[in-house]
């Protein structure tokens, strides 16, 4: 299912980030060595009333002058108008109505999609009265909230969720292995997809996907059905660098949410960038099976240690993805392209793997006996048993007397023991700790 996008726009300091954080909620950091994943994020998948959508905070600019401010607001609103399914235009109830707000409101009146005009920082009756000037705008869907104090936010989200487009997943898509090809612009995603489909000698049946020209292509490999989600078509003429950078990440995010296996495409000529780290981090956080595909390998000068050096670079930059296989290819020459589908089948098998409870507890008991959890508030942590409760990714529940006291390093230790014992290549593992009365 393609997730709808909700964009928050508005001047600096009107509370966009506060509302964004309020809707996203607090999220546990996965590990400390994950640059770009939990820091400086301005997009997130949110679920409200069992409805998932992608939320974007389009802010973060500090212009030098009022003219520059208006220019930034116009550009920001244009991005939202083109890319989002629902727009939240935030204004400051304390500061009052601003001429720049008025101009953007006039622009948003002409948009043929749901727009909510939201007056923020309305914390009490006095400010409610002061905010009445915003009603002079004469717009529908004008709501007052306090993102900081959670006032009116639920009512706002009731309206937003009701306005989201309804999308469904076909039975064919549910039963197929879905592969997302993601990466920043110019890493060679489009060429890679074309080569991959050509190599498999299939007749592609492209289906328009999102408004950013993503394309879904069905194909068959080794008598198995696959859906290839290609996000390569996002760079179009007349689009700004800001849009390319922001929405290439968002488009990848949408594809990742739909996928089982994510091909994270890197450019061998340019190495690993912060945006690569961001996209890979989201794939891991979303619980997807992953493969690193280093493209344009033909374009660099090589010696006997070139592969080893690049592998070391990836392992250094993506310490938390040490379980992800790496394939070096050239979309231009077709070099090693057959390895991609081989790895897809391998990691997919691990992604849906189930292990028996007896085997799991044999490994679990040995791991606990070999290395005890540190004391929590002076008390010993006891473990009772483990069981697998799900796949995509493999998910395990561990029963203990201190489910709230688990140290992240011990959780990582158990994950590594499970991975080593059961060969969970290419897939993240999820551990859930629950209490049990004795």
UniProtKB/Swiss-Prot annotation:
A Pfam family the protein falls into: MMR_HSR1
Keywords, sorted A to Z: GTP-binding, Nucleotide-binding, Repeat, Ribosome biogenesis
EngA-type G domain: residues covered: 4-168, 177-352
The UniProt record lists the keyword GTP-binding: yes
Binding site for GTP 1: 10-17, 57-61, 120-123
CDD domains: EngA1, EngA2
UniProt: GTP 2 binding residues: 183-190, 230-234, 295-298
Stored InterPro entries: G_ENGA, GTP-bd, GTPase_Der, KH_dom-like, KH_dom-like_a/b, P-loop_NTPase, Small_GTP-bd
SUPFAM superfamilies with a match to the protein in the record: P-loop containing nucleoside triphosphate hydrolases (SSF52540)
Highest taxon in the source lineage: Bacteria
GO MF terms held by the record: GTP binding; ribosome binding
Role of this protein: GTPase that plays an essential role in the late steps of ribosome biogenesis.
Subunit-structure text: Associates with the 50S ribosomal subunit.
Protein family membership: Belongs to the TRAFAC class TrmE-Era-EngA-EngB-Septin-like GTPase superfamily. EngA (Der) GTPase family.
HAMAP family recorded: GTPase_Der
Protein name from the UniProt record: GTPase Der
Protein species of origin: Geobacter sulfurreducens (strain ATCC 51573 / DSM 12127 / PCA)
């Amino acid at each position: 299912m393609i997730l709808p996008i909700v964009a928050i726009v508005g001047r600096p300091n009107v509370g966009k980030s506060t509302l964004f954080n309020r809707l996203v909620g607090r999220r546990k950091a996965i590990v400390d060595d994950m640059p770009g994943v939990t820091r400086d994020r301005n997009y997130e998948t949110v679920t409200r009333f069992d409805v998932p959508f992608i939320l974007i905070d389009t802010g973060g600019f500090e212009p030098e002058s009022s003219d520059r401010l208006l220019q930034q607001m116009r550009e920001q609103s244009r991005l939202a108008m083109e890319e989002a399914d629902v727009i939240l235009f935030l204004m400051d109830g304390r500061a009052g109505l601003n001429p720049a707000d008025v101009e953007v409101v006039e622009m948003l009146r002409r948009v043929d999609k749901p727009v909510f005009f939201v007056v923020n920082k309305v914390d009490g009756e006095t400010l409610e009265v002061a905010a009445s000037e915003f009603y002079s705008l004469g717009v529908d869907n004008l709501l007052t909230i306090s993102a900081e104090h959670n006032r009116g936010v639920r009512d706002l989200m009731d309206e937003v969720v009701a306005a989201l487009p309804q999308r469904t997943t076909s039975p064919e898509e549910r039963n197929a292995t879905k592969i997302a090809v993601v990466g920043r612009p110019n890493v060679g995603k489009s060429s890679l997809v074309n080569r991959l489909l050509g190599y498999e000698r299939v007749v592609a049946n492209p289906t328009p996907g999102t408004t950013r020209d993503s394309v879904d292509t069905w194909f068959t490999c080794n008598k198995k059905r696959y859906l290839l989600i290609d996000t390569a078509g996002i760079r179009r003429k007349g689009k700004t660098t800001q849009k390319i950078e922001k929405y290439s990440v968002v488009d990848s995010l949408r594809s990742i949410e739909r996928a089982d296996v994510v091909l994270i495409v890197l450019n061998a000529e340019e190495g690993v960038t912060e945006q690569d780290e961001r996209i890979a981090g989201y794939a891991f956080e979303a619980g997807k099976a992953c493969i690193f595909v280093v493209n344009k390998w033909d374009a660099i000068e090589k010696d006997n240690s070139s592969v080893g050096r690049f592998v070391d670079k990836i392992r250094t930059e993506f310490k938390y993805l040490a379980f992800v296989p790496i394939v070096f290819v050239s979309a231009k020459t077709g070099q090693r392209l057959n390895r991609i589908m081989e790895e897809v089948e391998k990691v997919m098998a691990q992604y849906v793997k189930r292990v028996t409870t007896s085997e799991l507890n044999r490994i679990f008991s040995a791991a606990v006996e070999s290395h005890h959890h540190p004391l929590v508030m002076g008390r010993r942590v006891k473990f009772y048993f483990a069981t697998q409760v799900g796949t995509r990714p493999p998910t395990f529940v561990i029963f203990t007397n201190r489910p709230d006291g688990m140290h992240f390093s011990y959780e990582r230790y158990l994950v590594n023991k499970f991975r080593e014992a059961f060969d969970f290549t290419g897939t993240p593992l999820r551990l859930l700790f629950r209490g049990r009365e004795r």
